[in-house]
């Protein structure tokens, strides 16, 4: 335990308990706080209590086909993920990875390109040449247009050349393409005899967000995805669900009785979920003009985190049990009328400002953005959950571009103590307890509570106990795609989004967007780049006597 300075936190004194004045106490201990941290020089003393994944059957040999393999996603995320799975000996005993794209390449030229890009995008450096060579022998390239039936016939012949067993029958199709092309690809692989609802082996389809742009388009997309496949064969990826700290939400809640018994309206005052980005839209202006922060972040990432934070305990860890509870939670969110949305939702857009001492342009000055655009780069909302556990507890969500820092954090703010003893002396200045789950960066969990400041006076101030992933387990943290690809091969759907989850989330988002149609942004909805959002966002919480808590950079 060590003393550190804690900027922005005020010293609190419990009045006249030991005949010391507040000013005396301030003079004695201003600027001093205590944070309990992990001593990284001490080795782990506690062995693992158990490994649930140890009961999983060995992964079956399979072939993975990446459609749109010449795009950034393959080089930046997919191939590095497969490489690290090989390095960690997590891949099946036999596998093949086929890249399908229009560009004219050979197996060898594609392998060489990927090797060069791995130098930039691998999370571990340097790249292990022995691991790469063993991995690269399983990389193949199939040139073809997504609409050309002959190209799929060529793909089928390539798969058949691997043998008649699992490498031909167990197939994972990764659609790294535009959503508008999903239907075409699925129909073509079905016609080529590669995709079946029932039959030998297994076939699965992996798709990336966006899963539509509203409820109607999402329903249409879901019909296309399940035209030739069962719902359990479809893996909808939200990379947030692959993050270690997001997965740890369920572990934190349901393997620790000390916290779960506080996780309800009796103890919790409100919950804040912040996903802030320090960067602007950059060269994604064209995409952002169609999406905006609500569709880009709230519909998927933020509602997924909310569902994990607030869901009821599942009856088991089986995929459908977990996903059932997430859907129940989303359906429990109180529907927003246009009048409700006007009170409970705030949008914003950044104008020119300064970040790290450097000037940055406003959203309307970004490339491919309309000069009079009303698209939101920031959104904050208050959601209410109508169930026994959370009735009356507001959940505040906010996300935005060009904010002061990039961070994702969930803060559980507990109710204040009764107005006696220390609370009676300090009044509203006595800090309330909180648990914060830091999803990124500096992943970890900290508990905020009040403690006595050392000294002759009875000084009270907030202190933190901090659990850091890096300090406790070392710097090894797999990328989200590594875990998600492994789960797709294994056929475990827990970390993938089910059809009804997608559609329920779109119902929430659509009800908000209806209230914005045709309405221009007001002055209180603009914010300078490098600040924490528009004034209207503070007004949203002030209605209930709450304030935003900015994520704190704890190392």
Model-based region annotation:
Residues 34-207, 211-555:
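Secretory/organelle targeting and membrane-embedding segments
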């Amino acid at each position: 335990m060590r003393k550190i300075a804690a900027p922005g936190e005020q010293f609190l004194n419990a009045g006249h308990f030991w005949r010391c004045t507040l000013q005396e106490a301030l003079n004695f201990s201003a600027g001093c706080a205590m944070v309990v941290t992990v001593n990284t020089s001490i080795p782990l003393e506690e062995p693992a209590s158990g490994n649930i994944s140890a009961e999983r059957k060995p992964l079956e040999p399979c072939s993975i086909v990446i459609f749109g393999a010449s795009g950034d996603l393959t080089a930046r995320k997919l191939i590095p993920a497969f490489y690290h799975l090989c390095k960690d000996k997590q891949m099946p005993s036999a596998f093949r990875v086929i890249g399908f794209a229009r560009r004219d390449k050979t197996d060898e030229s594609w392998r060489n390109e990927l090797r060069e890009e791995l130098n930039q995008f691998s999370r571990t450096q340097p790249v292990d040449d022995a691991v790469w060579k063993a991995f690269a022998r399983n990389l193949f390239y199939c040139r073809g247009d997504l609409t050309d039936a002959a190209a799929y016939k060529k793909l089928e012949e390539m798969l058949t050349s691997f043998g008649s067993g699992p490498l031909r029958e167990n197939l994972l199709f990764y659609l790294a393409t535009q959503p508008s092309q999903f239907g075409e690809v699925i129909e073509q692989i079905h016609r080529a005899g590669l995709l079946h609802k029932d039959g030998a082996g297994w076939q699965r389809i992996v798709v990336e967000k966006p899963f539509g742009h509203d409820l109607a388009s999402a329903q249409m997309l879901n019909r296309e995805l399940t035209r030739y496949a069962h719902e359990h064969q479809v893996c909808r990826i939200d990379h947030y669900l692959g993050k270690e700290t997001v997965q740890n939400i369920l572990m934190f809640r349901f393997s620790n009785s000390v916290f779960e018994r506080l996780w309800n309206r009796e103890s919790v005052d409100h919950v804040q979920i912040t996903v802030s980005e320090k960067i602007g839209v950059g060269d994604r202006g064209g995409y952002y003009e169609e999406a905006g922060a609500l569709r880009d972040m709230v519909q998927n990432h933020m509602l997924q985190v909310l569902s994990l934070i607030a869901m009821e305990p599942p009856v088991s860890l089986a995929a459908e049990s977990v996903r059932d509870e997430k859907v129940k939670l989303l359906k429990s969110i109180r529907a927003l009328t246009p009048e409700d949305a006007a009170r409970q939702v705030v949008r914003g857009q950044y104008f020119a400002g300064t970040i790290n001492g450097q000037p940055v342009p406003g959203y309307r000055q970004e490339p491919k953005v309309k000069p009079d655009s009303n698209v939101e780069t920031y959104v904050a909302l208050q959601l209410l959950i109508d169930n026994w556990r959370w009735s009356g507890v507001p959940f505040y969500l906010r996300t935005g571009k060009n904010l002061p820092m990039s961070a994702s954090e969930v803060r559980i703010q507990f109710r204040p103590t009764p107005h006696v003893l220390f609370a009676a002396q300090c009044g509203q200045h006595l800090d309330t307890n909180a648990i914060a789950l830091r999803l990124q960066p500096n992943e970890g969990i900290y508990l905020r509570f009040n403690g006595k400041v050392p000294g002759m006076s009875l000084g009270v101030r907030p202190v933190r106990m901090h659990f850091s992933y890096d300090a406790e387990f070392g710097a090894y943290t797999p990328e989200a795609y590594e875990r998600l690809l492994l789960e797709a091969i294994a056929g475990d759907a827990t970390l993938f989004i089910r059809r009804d989850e997608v559609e329920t989330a779109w119902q929430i988002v659509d009800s908000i967007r209806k209230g914005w149609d045709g309405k221009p942004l007001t002055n209180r909805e603009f914010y300078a780049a490098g600040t924490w959002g528009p004034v209207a966002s503070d007004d949203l919480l002030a209605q209930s006597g709450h304030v935003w808590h900015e994520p704190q950079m704890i190392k």
